């Protein structure tokens, strides 16, 4: 589960339009906007290096931040988009949405797999095929999980892992209302070839 909410520093951006945004970039900032929460949008500047470091850590769009802006009350936000330079792939603008801890939000949560060494199907040479490396969940803003965990213990060749097989955090609900596939364990190619030959002989 998500732990302590990290702080994110920003400054109020004076001026509007492309000119102010370009000036911010020249001074080492990434222009951004904070919206929602029943308040007027707030134009901000985010330190470029801070944003880049956060992006490199991963799960930036799945992280709830405590936004600290001088002269403003601290507010919980979540990133709703990062625009990037089409050539350099570096951030040029960032959007944040204000949230309450009890707000509900849809997020893609990463799926991890554990106990590979306890899966007989993998020991026999089977291959774990991941169909959905991320799952979109509706979650409470104050309880965003870091990831979902799939336990591979006792999994055999031919096993199919569905979303209903995963223990979801309390209050988390998949946005897709069906028991969709997360992953499966397929037979090694040699075993599949042998099975096909046997079927051909029987035919």
From Swiss-Prot:
One of its GO terms (cellular component) is cytosolic large ribosomal subunit. The keyword Transcription does not apply. Pfam families: Ribosomal_L25p, Ribosomal_TL5_C. One of its GO terms (biological process) is translation. It comes from the Bacteria. Keywords: Ribonucleoprotein, Ribosomal protein, RNA-binding, rRNA-binding. The keyword Methyltransferase does not apply. Part of the 50S ribosomal subunit; part of the 5S rRNA/L5/L18/L25 subcomplex. Contacts the 5S rRNA. Binds to the 5S rRNA independently of L5 and L18. Belongs to the bacterial ribosomal protein bL25 family. CTC subfamily. This is one of the proteins that binds to the 5S RNA in the ribosome where it forms part of the central protuberance. This is Large ribosomal subunit protein bL25. It comes from Cereibacter sphaeroides (strain ATCC 17023 / DSM 158 / JCM 6121 / CCUG 31486 / LMG 2827 / NBRC 12203 / NCIMB 8253 / ATH 2.4.1.). The gene is rplY.
